[in-house]
Curated annotation (Swiss-Prot):
Keywords, ordered alphabetically: Ribonucleoprotein, Ribosomal protein, RNA-binding, rRNA-binding
One cellular-component annotation, GO: ribosome
GO MF term list: rRNA binding; structural constituent of ribosome
Gene name, Swiss-Prot/TrEMBL: rplX
Family in the record: Belongs to the universal ribosomal protein uL24 family.
NCBIfam families xrefs: rplX_bact (TIGR01079)
Family matches, as InterPro entries: KOW, Rib_uL2_dom2, Ribosomal_uL24, Ribosomal_uL24_CS, Ribosomal_uL24_KOW, Translation_prot_SH3-like_sf
Subunit structure and binding partners: Part of the 50S ribosomal subunit.
Protein name: Large ribosomal subunit protein uL24
Lineage of producing organism: Bacteria, Pseudomonadati, Pseudomonadota, Alphaproteobacteria, Hyphomicrobiales
Amino acid sequence: MQKIKKGDKVVVLSGRDKGRTGEVLKMMPKEDRALVRGVNLVRRHQKQTPQAEGGIITKEAPIHVSNLALADPKDGKPTRVGFKIQEDGKKVRVAKRSGELIDG
């Protein structure tokens, strides 16, 4: 089970976007990277196509997961993630900072 998943709210720990929060749009587990909304924005030159207009566009670039921490559901601050097995045998993620369940 992964510590960070698609749809999670995360906080950037280091880099030029340090302190920013965003939602994980896509996980890339083989590269240990994540695409986060509004974080690590880069400008790209896009060639004109019949469907899309050309020009300089701004989009998110992948960021390494070591530079991300899950936002605590209680106060939004960065937290580490632990795992807990519930009575029904389901494995769930738990915020180490507050003890809150992250999923489930």
